[in-house]
Amino acid sequence: MYKFRSKDMSHVFTPIKLNLALHVVGQRADGYHLIESLVYFSLSGDYLHYEPCESDQFVLTGPFAKELISHPDNLVVRARDFMHKTFPEGAHPTFFRLVKTLPVASGIGGGSGDAAGVISILRQQWNLDCPFEKLAKMSLVLGADVPMCLFALEYHQPLLVKGIGQEIIQLKEACSLAIVLVNHGQEISTQAVFKALDKRHHPSLKIDPIALKSVDSLVEALQETRNDLFSPALKMAPQLTQVLSILDECGSLFSRMSGTGATCFGIFKNQQTAQQAALLIKSMHPNWFVKSIMTLGTI
């Protein structure tokens, strides 16, 4: 089993976010796109460690640290500064160490999960008297995926997310899924993908909550859904087709790109078959990011 939050919240494995379905249903006057998405999570992402200290410090390590260093807009630092600014009366200097194990700009919410980890840790460490839902809503300023990642850390459930990420519905009866993640190594800009959309008003996401209760019924229901961002992402990263084909060939029951890419996922019958597929794909493509995970679920 994956390690969840410790009781003293001094460290956390941050959420991996998976958009099993993602429909773009409109665009606001301010340019933000409106989405409807079925989102599953696994608490097996980056490792975030906290300690109190004399002055704010941040250390970045891990296999994908180099890629993140070149991104000046680090979400761990932004989330820390957000908490300092929002709760100055309870704030204290922090030391954070992030072990970056997830690819950067890969469509699985790595940075947003890191930000959510910072907020969750500091909410407890500073003993803040702020309702969770209010804090989650406030965190939207850090990015559309941050509130949903906070919900994953707090409630350990899949979600239905709407709007620009602020409308969150908990799915309290959903099975856990055995998933294999595959990323061929190309970063894809979220902004560029949305900008390249041919149209911004697609049909709404409709999925029967009963379908979430078993792997087979969920896979069947997903056949009637989409990721509307796949088409523009494919133009930027043609290798996505190969990644999806390999997942299918290795026994995936359903394969799709998550978010704006480039990470793709495959749903497998059980954890054992997922782990076997991950080993096979890694042996064929040793330079790819490949990871077998189990998602959060209540069944």
Curated annotation (Swiss-Prot):
Keyword Disulfide bond: no
GO molecular function, one term: 4-(cytidine 5'-diphospho)-2-C-methyl-D-erythritol kinase activity
Pathway: Isoprenoid biosynthesis; isopentenyl diphosphate biosynthesis via DXP pathway; isopentenyl diphosphate from 1-deoxy-D-xylulose 5-phosphate: step 3/6
Keyword set, alphabetical order: ATP-binding, Isoprene biosynthesis, Kinase, Nucleotide-binding, Transferase
Record family assignment: Belongs to the GHMP kinase family. IspE subfamily.
Function: Catalyzes the phosphorylation of the position 2 hydroxy group of 4-diphosphocytidyl-2C-methyl-D-erythritol.
Designated name of the protein: 4-diphosphocytidyl-2-C-methyl-D-erythritol kinase
Designated gene of the protein: ispE
